[in-house]
UniProtKB/Swiss-Prot annotation:
Documented EC number(s): 3.5.3.11
EC top class, as a word: hydrolase
Pathway(s) this gene product operates in, as recorded in its UniProt entry: Amine and polyamine biosynthesis; putrescine biosynthesis via agmatine pathway; putrescine from agmatine: step 1/1
GO CC list: mitochondrion
Species assigned in the record: Gallus gallus (Chicken)
Gene Ontology molecular function: agmatinase activity; metal ion binding
Binding annotation for Mn(2+) 1: H150, D173, D177, D264
Name of the protein described by the UniProt record: Agmatinase, mitochondrial
Cofactors named for this entry: Mn(2+)
Tagged with keyword Transit peptide: yes
Subcellular localization: Mitochondrion
Pfam family, one: Arginase
Length: 340
């Protein structure tokens, strides 16, 4: 299911047995090593420099890479997203100083490597992703996914809904991703949520899409979403304002049911996140992204993803750094995370 090199496992054991011990403070959880004791360039390139393991068994939450961009319609490169997000995550520390969240004092978390996708066959990749996530979800672990293009969310939600039933969705994106097909193909990064509706994977009364914008092929690009009962919040409704009030409404709408967070990095303005395949001008800010994710605290979150980071268009590394921090923020709002 998960591809990991034997040498990576050995290096991880050596690193975390010898170098990370000083920052564990007798914790029974995995803890990112402090740069006070372990230099940031040292060790295996894992998410947050956490231990690497081949299975999600025994974990409360796991970072999972899905290095696939076969479903892209514009600029490729998201297959390298997981690798670069992991590399930039060395800057993320143990505690969330802004919210007080202490995920590594609360949950057992590790990096379980990458799904062995088939870059030559998108339907087969979807099967591989679905089967991998069925095992992860069945173990009781909450997956936090490093994408990859947005087509990966469809098979992930197949696995998640198999266990939890139809889920609510907090979807941040420049696009609704509800197209039906392109060039005769029904699976690509513009169709995941259409396919999810077709298969009953979403509780459509609890779907919110935030940051949608850009030109359209149709005169009413939101008609399909509205017809399903989705709430669409265009980017224009977010300009120059805090999204804290909006997220209060979202929490009420989501209620106690299972919720999945899907965050396409192109939901943010390309001034902040240029390293993506289908950028659209006039998007959200990083501060609004934090308000959205932190506003999900208290929800019954059963999975998250951060998709569409394409490092080849990210010269400074800022897009991947932003992605790494947003994934950390998602970890911080999972059920069971204590505050200091």
């Amino acid at each position: 299911m998960i591809c990991l090199l034997r040498t990576a496992r050995l290096s991880a054991r050596l690193l975390f047995a010898s170098a990370a011990a000083p920052c564990r403070r007798a914790s029974r959880f995995n803890v990112p090593p402090s740069a006070e004791f372990v230099a940031r360039p040292v060790g295996v390139c894992s998410m947050l420099r956490l231990p690497v393991q081949t299975s999600a068994e025994g974990l409360d939450a796991a970072f999972v890479g899905v290095p696939l961009d076969t479903g892209t319609s514009n600029r490729p490169g998201a297959r390298f997203g997981p690798q670069q997000i992991r590399a930039e995550s060395v800057m993320v520390r143990r505690y969330n100083a802004s919210t007080g969240a202490a995920p590594f004092d609360s949950l057992l978390v590790a990096d379980v490597g990458d799904v062995n996708v088939n870059l030559y066959n998108l339907p087969d990749s979807c099967r591989r992703i679905r089967e991998s996530y069925q095992k992860i979800v069945a173990s009781g672990c909450v997956p936090l996914t490093l994408g990859g293009d947005h087509s990966i969310t469809y098979p992930i939600l197949q696995a998640v809904a198999e266990k939890h039933g139809p889920v609510g969705l907090v979807h941040v994106d420049a696009h609704t991703d509800t197209s039906d097909m392109a060039l005769g193909e029904k699976i690509y990064h513009g169709t995941p949520f259409r396919r999810c509706v077709d298969e009953g994977l979403l509780d459509c009364s609890r779907v919110v899409q935030i940051g949608i914008r850009g030109s359209s092929y149709a005169p009413n690009p939101y008609k399909y979403c509205w017809d399903q009962g989705f709430r669409v919040v265009p980017a224009e409704e977010c300009w120059m304002k805090s999204l804290v009030p909006l997220m209060g409404e979202v929490r009420q709408q989501m209620g106690d049911g299972p919720v999945y967070i899907s965050f396409d990095i192109d939901g943010l303005d390309p001034a902040y996140a240029p390293g993506t395949g289908t950028p659209e001008i006039a998007g959200l800010t990083p501060m609004q992204a934090l308000e959205i994710i932190r506003g999900c605290k208290g929800l019954n979150i059963v999975g998250c993803d951060l998709v569409e980071v394409a490092p080849i268009y990210d010269v400074s590394g800022n897009t991947a750094l932003l992605g790494a921090n947003l994934l950390f923020e998602m970890l911080c709002v999972l059920p069971g995370v204590k505050t200091m």
